[in-house]
Design a protein with these regions (language model features):
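A conserved mid-protein helix/loop that constitutes part of the nucleotide-sugar donor-binding site
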Residues: 21-32, 193, 197-219, 233-236
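Short hydrophobic beta-strand element within catalytic cores of glycosyltransferases
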Residues: 45, 291-295
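Conserved acidic donor-binding segment of nucleotide-sugar-dependent glycosyltransferases
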Residues: 306-307, 311-318, 327-332
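Short His-centered aromatic/hydrophobic patch
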Residues: 76, 97-103, 122
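A conserved, positively charged/aromatic
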Residues: 111-146
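Nucleotide-activated donor-binding/catalytic signature segment of Leloir-type glycosyltransferases, i.e.
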Residues: 239-255
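Acidic donor-binding loop of glycosyltransferase active sites
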Residues: 265-277, 290
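A short, active-site helix/loop in glycosyltransferases that binds the activated sugar's phosphate group
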Residues: 139-162, 169-173
Length: 364
């Protein structure tokens, strides 16, 4: 049997420590696509936690933890720079960052590795001038949707440097964890209905809307429990507000969950209260037939066809968010119709070929 050719190019992917849904799943798929295309793949995680780094390491990828805290800090940036320089990346090689916080880190790498191609993938529209400044120093910006591309243009990123490539709907396989086992592990009642939201605990996720909706749903539906998966600087504020609104017994918050692929297939609904790439768990949930409800955002409009695969609700009045969730939970036929349509739509709108397009774009 002939020996496999040695990889001729190296890609360093830079991301937060994530779980295998949303952007985390996209990173797993991208790593596999680069390896299949003959690239040597290194992945650097700039925050602690998350199951994706361990999953990538188990799959044979060179995985590097450059952080010990749940947020990107100066120490992680310094370690990332040192590690990136140790790879001696040259002209054929590439750096691919995932998300806006990582795009800002990339600005520190640009002057130190000027010969490597720098690409930044964004799943949510950039908002601030600092991010725009960093993106303008990249060779390529991979926008996950037309709305993201427009946001880049608003920050004066040249159109010639922006390519729009939608995410790929290819959920991580379940590991065979049963509902009863999940209930024991997560402290849930197996006989209740479960909902799932995956979001960073940051202001843009607008999690106060989620808490208000949980509070309102508790009045009309007593057999509901809610799982929120996310880490970030808003955690203490969120938990304090949950206690004030007396929803703590129904809300289960975890910074990370390695069992998300199994949990995703057991929930009654996935929902999202703010602007989160891939809708958090919405894209993956729709691909396995879970109805979705989200407050209007660029990601929601990309993932959900309102009235066909789930519901998109306005931010005001606030009552619309829990009302639409309740309507699906109480109508099995409606939920089944949304589930079937969601699976068909994600297969057509977010095909597996997207990762090949990503590799080609990064390669130049």
């Amino acid at each position: 049997m002939p020996a496999m050719p040695q990889p001729s190019r190296t890609v360093l992917m830079v991301s937060r420590g994530l779980d295998p849904v949303g952007t985390g799943r996209q990173i797993e798929l991208a790593a596999a696509a680069f390896r299949d295309a003959g690239w040597r793949v290194h992945v650097a995680a700039t925050t602690a936690g998350g199951a994706v780094p361990e999953r990538l390491a188990a799959a044979g990828f060179a995985m590097h933890r450059v952080a010990t805290r749940p947020v990107v800090d100066a120490a992680a940036a310094v370690r990332l720079v040192r590690f990136a320089r140790s790879l001696r990346l040259e002209g054929p090689d590439a750096i691919l960052t995932w998300g806006r916080s990582q795009a800002r880190l990339a600005a520190a790498l640009r002057p130190l590795l000027p010969r490597a191609r720098l690409a930044c993938q964004l799943g949510s529209p950039p908002r601030d001038r600092l991010t725009g400044w960093c993106l303008r120093r990249a060779d390529l910006v991979v926008a996950g949707s037309p709305a993201v591309a427009r946001g880049c243009g608003d920050l004066h990123v040249a159109d010639t440097r922006v390519v729009t490539i939608p995410p790929t709907a290819d959920p991580a396989a379940a590991a065979g964890v049963t509902r009863a086992e999940l209930a024991v592990r997560l402290g849930l009642d197996p006989d209740t209905l479960w909902t799932l939201c995956v979001a960073p605990l940051e202001a843009e996720a607008r999690l106060e809307r989620l808490l208000w909706a949980i509070d309102q749903l508790g009045v009309v539906h007593r057999r509901l429990e809610h799982v929120l998966v996310g880490a970030g600087p808003q955690r203490q504020r969120l938990m304090r507000r949950a206690r004030m609104q007396q929803v703590g017994e129904r809300l289960h918050v975890f910074p990370h969950l390695d069992c998300l692929p199994d949990l995703l297939r057991q929930v009654a609904i996935v929902w999202q209260s703010g602007e989160v790439a891939c809708g958090g768990a919405i894209l993956d949930g729709q691909a396995v037939g879970i109805p979705a409800v989200a407050v209007d955002s660029a990601a929601a409009r990309q993932c959900i066809v309102d009235g066909e695969t789930g519901r998109i609700v306005p931010a005001d009045p606030e009552s619309e968010f829990p009302r639409r969730v309740f309507g699906i939970l109480e109508d099995d036929a409606l939920a089944a119709r949304y589930a079937t349509a969601a699976q068909h739509r994600t297969a057509a709108a977010f095909p597996a070929g997207g990762m090949a397009a990503l590799v080609a774009a990064v390669a130049g």
